[in-house]
């Protein structure tokens, strides 16, 4: 991708740059290999299967919030075992703050998983004064410039940042919310499409029904919320003019929604896919207020209903997210959110958060990559499933 010397002055310029970089990245990486058709082995562990085992179809795991700037977390990544062929990992943001650390982590993960998918969290977009990770590559001195530099890093590491089909074999496939109670089902294809959903939080998230009962619509930001992500730096084209370190501008979330729509309209990244293909989406931020299980004191910096609407609009049956460091695995009725174009898709979606988080937050095996597709028929829907 060609670097730029000066920050473009308009929102459309930034939109073209970021969406174009994602589409270009998708074209530069080879297509994933098709599953071999080897027989399944139900005795394999879901957290650390033997690397010599090759499943009949692709398996997809999810994790978020690695925060590998912390030495303890980096050692955790280094200690991860290798997973079998045809195993993919979704990394739902907050790998690290420094690009060099993010690169190291992504390379380590690519050694352990055949395919790795990534979407930026807020920590990746923190930007110190120049020279920094954005400017040394010739990109604008702001968080979107840093995102462009991170897309370059992902391409160099073989990590995917755009919608990608993991091709399976004809036969039994499963993993969507519809399978959670009925088990695997017969399909014409065992393909699965993995779709990164870029996003940012907005104030409206805290005012929706699920969170609003705990959050006053009229209250001011808490101290934690007010300075949240002051490490980011936003161009005036999408942020608040004269306040580049203010991450609360509504234009940030709407910009990323437009990036998604632009990428998904491109022929090389087009979604939704054909009928009968499962769709896995993932974001860093919380996609719906109803699946946010954290404190109301942080609700204004947690997520956006727009993320969930976009994910469900392309037919997602499983959505992986992060950010709040509160793990979840629930199947939720989303019939009130589904876009008309997706009305024939499932009206239920599985939402999974599996955060490594900070060392002080971990207990037991928390943070081990969690299998999110295909879903094992023996797994429960989760204690908080809504219907």
Feature roles, as predicted:
Residues 2-119, 124-135:
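N-terminal active-site segment of His-dependent metallophosphoesterases
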Residues 53-61, 165-195, 276-278, 331-336, ...:
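Beta-strand-turn-beta hairpins that frame and shape the catalytic cleft
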Residues 54, 293, 298-299, 305-317, ...:
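Binuclear metal-dependent phosphoesterase catalytic core
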Residues 67-72, 96-100, 123-134, 162, ...:
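Active-site environment of divalent metal-dependent phosphoester hydrolases
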Residues 105, 143-146, 297-306:
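Charged helix-capping and loop-helix junction motifs
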Residues 128-144, 294-298:
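Short, flexible/disordered intra-domain loops and linkers
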Residues 140-171, 188-230:
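Hydrophobic alpha-helical segments and helix pairs
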Residues 178, 195-281, 285-297:
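Active-site-proximal loop/helix segment associated with metal-binding centers of metalloenzymes
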């Amino acid at each position: 991708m060609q670097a730029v010397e000066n920050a473009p002055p308009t929102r459309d310029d930034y939109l073209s740059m970021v969406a174009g970089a994602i589409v270009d990245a998708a074209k530069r990486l080879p297509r994933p290999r098709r599953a071999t058709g080897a027989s399944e082995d139900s005795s394999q562990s879901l957290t650390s299967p033997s690397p010599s085992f090759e499943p009949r179809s692709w398996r997809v795991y999810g994790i978020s919030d690695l925060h590998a700037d912390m030495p303890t977390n980096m050692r955790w990544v280094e200690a991860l075992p290798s997973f079998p062929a045809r195993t993919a990992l979704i990394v739902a943001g907050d790998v690290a703050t420094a690009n060099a650390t993010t690169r190291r982590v992504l390379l380590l993960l690519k050694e352990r998983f055949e395919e790795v998918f990534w979407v930026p969290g807020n920590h990746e977009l923190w930007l110190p004064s120049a020279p920094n990770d954005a400017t040394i590559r010739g990109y604008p001195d702001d968080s979107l410039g840093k995102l462009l530099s991170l897309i370059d890093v992902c391409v160099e590491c073989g990590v995917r940042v755009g919608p990608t089909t993991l091709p399976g074999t004809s036969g039994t496939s499963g993993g969507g919310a519809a399978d959670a109670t009925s088990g695997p089902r017969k399909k014409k294809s065992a393909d699965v499409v993995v779709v990164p959903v870029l996003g940012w939080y907005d104030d409206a998230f805290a005012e929706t029904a699920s969170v609003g009962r705990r959050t006053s619509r009229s209250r001011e930001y808490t101290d934690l919320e007010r300075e949240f992500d002051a490490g980011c730096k936003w161009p005036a084209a999408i942020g608040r003019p004269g306040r580049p370190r203010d991450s609360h501008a509504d234009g940030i979330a709407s910009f990323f929604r437009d990036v998604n729509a632009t990428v998904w309209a491109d022929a090389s990244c087009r979604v939704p896919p054909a009928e009968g293909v499962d769709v896995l989406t993932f974001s860093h931020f919380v996609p719906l207020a109803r699946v946010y299980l954290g404190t109301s004191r942080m609700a204004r910096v947690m997520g956006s209903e727009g993320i969930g609407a976009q994910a469900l609009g392309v037919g997602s049956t499983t959505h992986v997210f992060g950010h709040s460091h509160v793990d979840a695995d629930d199947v939720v009725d989303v019939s009130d959110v589904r876009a008309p174009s997706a009305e024939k898709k499932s009206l239920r979606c599985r939402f999974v958060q599996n955060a490594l988080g900070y060392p002080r937050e971990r207990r037991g095996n928390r943070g081990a990559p969690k299998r999110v597709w295909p879903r094992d028929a023996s797994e429960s829907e989760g204690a908080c499933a809504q219907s």
